[in-house]
């Protein structure tokens, strides 16, 4: 009773106007010493985040792997790394974009069974285009915060080999009467060209961003930085000429090109406009892959003695002009950071999805971000962009990098643009930065 009374007192204090501070309740949640949520173990933490390698669609190592097998591998990895009883998971939410809705929902349910989850654990899908994996993580965090359950998994899945892009069915002719609705149908490459043209992003700037992405991703791979986040997948690959099957274990992203140069990229022709600047070399790759994040209430993690990899702080989704959908992160990031009670300069690392170099460069410049803080291990241009899985992949990459950096890295942001004109961003805090009171075991 005394604890409940004290908690009410703290919450009421946040609701009362103060001459010394106008910080919101969500802002105070970022301050480990001044947070009702932290004090009572009610905030949402991440105890594991895993992904598969990302492989080139149609040509890569997962071209003969079923989507449900990709998802099962990362779901299984979360349980194996934490020894959490699968039956304790309140829900699994999977971000996925291209797979037919009812079929993909069934595939995800099948994947959970492959991974050892009992029939009592529910699963659902969510589709907010390229942010679907991040949306899944945010949905689970919100459900835990609301008290629907204490443990949940936010995941992402895409097989662009199995489910290639393309609009299916007819389009309502009335769409032509509404310019912004009509712009939702623009090819993503055209929106990239629109961003480059409207905001004067040069071809050289875009190509340089691509070179940097490959260079950093190649360095991260060579130094073993991705090993902690990548779950090896045992699968097969089929020779298209002979039909022979070969067993393989996939543990390395296969789209990274270490020898990418400005001169080499300059030779590539624009893909979407004859006089454009968007090429196959400065755009994200079509990829296959999956990722998954295990979240729980802090007091549950403490009771289980689990190390806390990160803390989920805030999430924001915003709308922008569909014709320049790539600007989404430039709007979503400030919204999420403000909700966390922070300034952009307080953020130590950013994972901004490189759908196209044009929009990546624009967002970086618009926000005035330090290039040394962004995509320090490369981005989607080098690693790949399996649409529904990208958010979960970025969360895994961010949190493992924050863990490596330790006390010098407290806050991180994941963000991406979204087809049809949106942006999403989430703020995370490094687990060790607010866990001085936790006596945790190593795994």
UniProtKB/Swiss-Prot annotation:
General function of this protein: Involved in fatty-acid beta-oxidation prior to gluconeogenesis during germination and subsequent seedling growth. Implicated in jasmonic acid (JA) biosynthesis.
Tissue specificity as recorded in UniProt: Low levels in seedlings and leaves.
Pathway: Lipid metabolism; fatty acid metabolism
Subunit and interaction comment: Homodimer.
Span of the transit peptide along the chain: 1-30
Enzyme Commission numbers on file: 2.3.1.16
A UniProt-annotated Pfam family: Thiolase_C
Protein family: Belongs to the thiolase-like superfamily. Thiolase family.
EC supergroup of this enzyme: transferase
Catalytic activity: an acyl-CoA + acetyl-CoA = a 3-oxoacyl-CoA + CoA
Location(s), subcellular: Peroxisome
Gene3D superfamilies: 3.40.47.10
Keywords: Acyltransferase, Fatty acid biosynthesis, Fatty acid metabolism, Lipid biosynthesis, Lipid metabolism, Oxylipin biosynthesis, Peroxisome, Transferase, Transit peptide
One Gene Ontology term from the biological process aspect of the record: fatty acid biosynthetic process
InterPro entries xref list: Thiolase (IPR002155), Thiolase-like (IPR016039), Thiolase-like_sf_Thiolase (IPR050215), Thiolase_acyl_enz_int_AS (IPR020615), Thiolase_AS (IPR020610), Thiolase_C (IPR020617), Thiolase_CS (IPR020613), Thiolase_N (IPR020616)
Protein name: 3-ketoacyl-CoA thiolase 1, peroxisomal
Main location: other
Gene: KAT1
Record-level Gene Ontology MF annotations: acetyl-CoA C-acyltransferase activity
UniProt-annotated catalytic positions: 130, 385, 417
GO cellular component terms, A-Z: peroxisome; plant-type vacuole
């Amino acid at each position: 009773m005394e604890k409940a009374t004290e908690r009410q007192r703290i919450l009421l204090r946040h609701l009362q106007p103060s001459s010394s501070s106008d910080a919101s309740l969500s802002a105070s949640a970022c301050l480990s010493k001044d947070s009702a949520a932290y004090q009572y173990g009610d905030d949402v933490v991440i105890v594991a985040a895993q992904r598969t390698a990302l492989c080139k669609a149609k040509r890569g190592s997962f071209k003969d792997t079923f989507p449900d097998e990709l998802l099962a591998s990362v779901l299984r990895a979360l349980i194996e790394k934490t020894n959490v009883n699968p039956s304790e998971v309140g829900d699994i939410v999977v971000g996925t974009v291209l797979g037919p809705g009812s079929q993909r929902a069934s595939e995800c349910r099948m994947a959970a069974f492959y991974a050892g989850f009992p029939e009592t654990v529910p699963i659902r899908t969510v589709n907010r285009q390229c942010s679907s994996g991040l949306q899944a993580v945010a949905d689970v965090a919100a459900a835990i915060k609301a008290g629907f359950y204490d443990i949940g998994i936010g995941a992402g899945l895409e097989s662009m080999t199995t489910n290639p892009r393309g609009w299916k069915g007819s389009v309502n002719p009335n769409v032509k009467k509404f310019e912004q609705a009509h712009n939702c149908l623009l090819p993503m490459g055209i929106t990239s060209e629109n961003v480059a043209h409207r905001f004067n992003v040069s071809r050289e700037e875009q190509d340089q961003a691509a070179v940097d992405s490959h260079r950093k991703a190649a360095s991260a791979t060579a130094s073993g930085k991705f090993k902690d986040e990548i779950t090896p997948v045992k699968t097969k690959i089929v020779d298209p000429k002979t039909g022979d099957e070969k067993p393989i274990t996939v543990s390395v992203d296969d789209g990274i090109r270490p020898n990418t140069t400005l001169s080499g990229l300059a030779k590539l022709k624009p893909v979407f406009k004859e006089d454009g600047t968007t090429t196959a070399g400065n755009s994200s790759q079509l990829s296959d892959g999956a990722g998954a994040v295990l979240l729980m209430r802090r007091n549950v993690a403490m009771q289980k003695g689990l190390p806390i990899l990160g803390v989920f702080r805030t999430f924001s989704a915003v709308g922008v002009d569909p014709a320049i959908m790539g600007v989404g992160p430039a709007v979503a990031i400030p919204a999420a950071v403000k909700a966390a009670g922070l300034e952009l300069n307080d953020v130590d690392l950013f994972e901004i999805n490189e759908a196209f170099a044009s929009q990546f460069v624009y967002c970086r410049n618009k926000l005035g971000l330090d290039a040394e803080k962004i995509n320090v291990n490369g981005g989607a241009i080098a690693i790949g962009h399996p649409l529904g899985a990208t958010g979960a992949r970025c969360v895994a990459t961010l949190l493992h990098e924050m863990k490596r950096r330790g006390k010098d890295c407290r806050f991180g942001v994941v963000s991406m643009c979204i087809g049809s004109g949106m942006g999403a961003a989430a703020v995370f805090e490094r687990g060790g930065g607010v866990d001085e009171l936790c006596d945790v075991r190593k795994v």
